[in-house]
């Protein structure tokens, strides 16, 4: 329903007489004149995009970081143009005020074009140009549409093309949010570490291929979850470097037509200052204008993280299964009734939604790959899809991880009696007897245990294979886990 409301409102804004008190201004482009709502900050090209692409209802302002990124790119471009003498300082001052207003969260409701669009992102670039130009006009006492004073093309798009601003804005959007994503992953790691410390010496059975294997501790299991996520954090750091090179100054195809000398370097320099990231000009502008390596690499890192989160979530779902006819090794916080027909049922909704998000991220990564390889010749026209896929993946993982941590992981408890029962009745500890009585005799013991339903320890005592002292020394559950407590001790900060 939301989709159709968004589309309908966007289109209604363009229909004369749709609202009784609505007034309009007239703007024109190469296709002719068009009425634009007088209070709209966008212009004629945005209006055409609203008519041409009422597709998903997911507008570019759905992700505020993307709108903020456009303001940063346009500000850096204006600053660079001023540095090289192409723009007057007075005009820069006006454009800077407009860009800073958008960076501060204002006027985002004017960034209305749909993410799904043809034209390699031209609709989005012009939406940004027109809105920022009209904000600048108002700030200097002019009316919207008086482009002889501040022009969307000549001023906001000076020394630029959609083909360099669009990929750069997407990269900036990713960079602005990557630190937050990493910070949240670090919090999730800390939560798993805390659970690992709390249950460090609680022994349980490890399983391979869903069958009992050898003993481990609950703490080891949770610390392993944390270690796995730490590897993904490093991958996010590593992937970020592929977002640093930008093709600002490439303009249409990478040859830099209409670009003043020194502009690419100055633009990257200003982008670095505005973002706090080491952004640099791409070494080959022609390649950078069609090459999607940055999107592919960062999307791959997000996919890898999603795979890890999904695996951990699936483990939690298994470990909490039951409560009477499943593993029931851990308890997850009960969040909501789980069934409209089965009384008392509570489902593991947080791990499940993490699975769902992970599946979406994996699908998005596939879309990024398809978009990346399908661009023809000197430009990739499918960057809007790649950009949306990655920015959505980034946001989904970030927000879901907050919920997963606070509503699930932080509240996990362990059913120690269940684990004790499993350890008493398991056949898994028979592996520890291999060095003592050999593999064949150990196998015979395991077979007897399965047939009789007895535990290994019970059979060992019946057959007097080991003395009680030997059992204590050789089959101590904690010793069998190989637990190295020093591995998990917090190191004092230097």
Model-predicted regions and their roles:
Residues 6-17:
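Bacterial N-terminal signal peptides
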């Amino acid at each position: 329903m939301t989709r159709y409301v968004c589309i309908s409102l966007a289109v209604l804004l363009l229909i004369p007489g749709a609202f009784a008190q609505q007034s309009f201004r007239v703007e024109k482009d190469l296709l002719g004149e068009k009425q634009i709502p007088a209070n709209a900050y966008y212009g004629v090209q945005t209006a055409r995009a609203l008519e041409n692409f009422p597709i998903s209802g997911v507008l570019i302002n759905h992700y505020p970081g993307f709108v903020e990124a456009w303001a940063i790119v346009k500000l850096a471009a204006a600053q660079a143009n001023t540095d090289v003498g192409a723009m007057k300082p007075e005009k820069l001052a006006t454009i800077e005020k407009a860009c800073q207003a958008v960076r501060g969260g204002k006027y985002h409701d004017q960034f209305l074009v749909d993410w799904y669009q043809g034209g390699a992102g031209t609709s989005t670039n012009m939406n940004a140009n027109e809105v920022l130009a009209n904000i600048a006009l108002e700030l200097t006492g002019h009316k919207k549409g008086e482009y002889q004073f501040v022009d969307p093309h000549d001023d906001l798009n000076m020394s630029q093309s959609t083909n360099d601003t669009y990929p750069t804005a997407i990269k900036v959007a990713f960079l602005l949010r990557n630190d937050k994503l990493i910070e949240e992953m670090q919090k999730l790691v800390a939560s798993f570490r805390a659970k690992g410390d709390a249950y460090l010496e609680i022994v349980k059975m490890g399983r391979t291929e869903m069958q009992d294997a050898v003993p481990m501790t609950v703490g080891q299991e949770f610390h392993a979850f944390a270690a796995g996520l730490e590897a993904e954090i490093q991958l996010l750091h590593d992937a970020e470097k592929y977002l640093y090179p930008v093709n600002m100054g490439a303009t249409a195809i990478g040859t830099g037509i209409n670009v003043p000398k020194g502009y690419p370097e100055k633009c990257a320099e200003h982008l670095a200052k505005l973002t706090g990231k080491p952004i640099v000009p791409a070494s080959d502008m022609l390649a950078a204008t069609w090459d999607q390596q940055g999107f592919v690499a960062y999307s791959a890192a997000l996919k890898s993280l999603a795979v890890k989160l999904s695996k951990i979530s699936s483990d939690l779902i298994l470990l909490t299964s039951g409560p009477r006819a499943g593993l029931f090794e851990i308890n997850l916080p009960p969040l909501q009734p789980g069934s409209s027909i089965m009384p008392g049922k509570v489902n593991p909704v947080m791990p499940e939604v993490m699975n769902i998000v992970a599946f979406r991220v994996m699908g998005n990564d596939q879309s990024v790959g398809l978009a990346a390889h399908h661009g023809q010749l000197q430009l990739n026209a499918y960057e809007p899809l790649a950009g949306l896929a990655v920015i959505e993946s980034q946001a989904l993982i970030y927000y879901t991880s907050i919920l997963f941590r606070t509503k699930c992981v932080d509240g996990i408890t362990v059913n120690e009696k269940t684990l004790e029962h499993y350890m008493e009745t398991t056949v898994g500890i028979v592996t520890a007897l291999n060095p003592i009585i050999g593999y064949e005799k150990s196998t015979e013991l395991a077979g007897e245990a399965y047939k009789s339903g007895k535990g290994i320890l019970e059979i060992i005592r019946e057959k007097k294979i080991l003395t009680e002292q030997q059992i204590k020394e050789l089959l101590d559950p904690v010793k069998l886990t190989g637990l190295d407590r020093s591995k998990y001790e917090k190191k004092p900060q230097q």
